[in-house]
Amino acid sequence: MTNXRKTHPLAKIVNNSFIDLPAPSNISAWWNFGSLLGVCLILQILTGLFLAMHYTSDTATAFSSVTHICRDVNYGWIIRYMHANGASMFFICLFMHVGRGLYYGSYVFMETWNIGIVLLFATMATAFMGYV
């Protein structure tokens, strides 16, 4: 009797991608933080775009525009909180990702490590400019 997940055309795609994934056995949960960084970044970009549609940066109306987002925009309060908490989650995932690289000795791959350091500094500079 043949296994349906290995013979059915659609189930075969799912099986090869998720169940019988050709990955080394030493991959742990620490390797998920790179993917979570991508998810957090997409969340930040999308919620930032939706918030920017209603935000005004004028000093006289900035606070009232944030109040408008929270009270008058449909689900504006949750978009604002997702954007604020997504930034914190992004940096938690970022530091866990760097910590995993330090723990497993990824710094020996100099080109990859240096690109990562440049991206880390660029991310920190962008976040600083967002707070200022």
Curated annotation (Swiss-Prot):
Keywords: Electron transport, Heme, Iron, Membrane, Metal-binding, Mitochondrion, Mitochondrion inner membrane, Respiratory chain, Transmembrane, Transmembrane helix, Transport, Ubiquinone. It comes from the Eukaryota. InterPro entries: Cyt_b/b6_N, Cytb/b6-like_sf, Cytochrome_b_N_euk/bac, Di-haem_cyt_TM. One of its GO terms (molecular function) is ubiquinol-cytochrome-c reductase activity. It is found in: Mitochondrion inner membrane. GO terms for cellular component: mitochondrial inner membrane. The keyword Transmembrane applies. CDD domains: Cytochrome_b_N. Binds 2 heme b groups non-covalently. Its cofactor is heme b. PROSITE patterns: CYTB_NTER. The chain crosses the membrane at residues 33-53, 77-98, 113-132. One of its GO terms (biological process) is mitochondrial electron transport, ubiquinol to cytochrome c. Its main location: mitochondrion. Heme b b562 binds at residue 83. It is a multi-pass membrane protein. Heme b b566 binds at residue 97. Heme 1 (or BL or b562) is low-potential and absorbs at about 562 nm, and heme 2 (or BH or b566) is high-potential and absorbs at about 566 nm. Component of the ubiquinol-cytochrome c reductase complex (complex III or cytochrome b-c1 complex) that is part of the mitochondrial respiratory chain. The b-c1 complex mediates electron transfer from ubiquinol to cytochrome c. Contributes to the generation of a proton gradient across the mitochondrial membrane that is then used for ATP synthesis. The cytochrome bc1 complex contains 11 subunits: 3 respiratory subunits (MT-CYB, CYC1 and UQCRFS1), 2 core proteins (UQCRC1 and UQCRC2) and 6 low-molecular weight proteins (UQCRH/QCR6, UQCRB/QCR7, UQCRQ/QCR8, UQCR10/QCR9, UQCR11/QCR10 and a cleavage product of UQCRFS1). This cytochrome bc1 complex then forms a dimer. Belongs to the cytochrome b family. This is Cytochrome b. It comes from Canis simensis. The gene is MT-CYB.
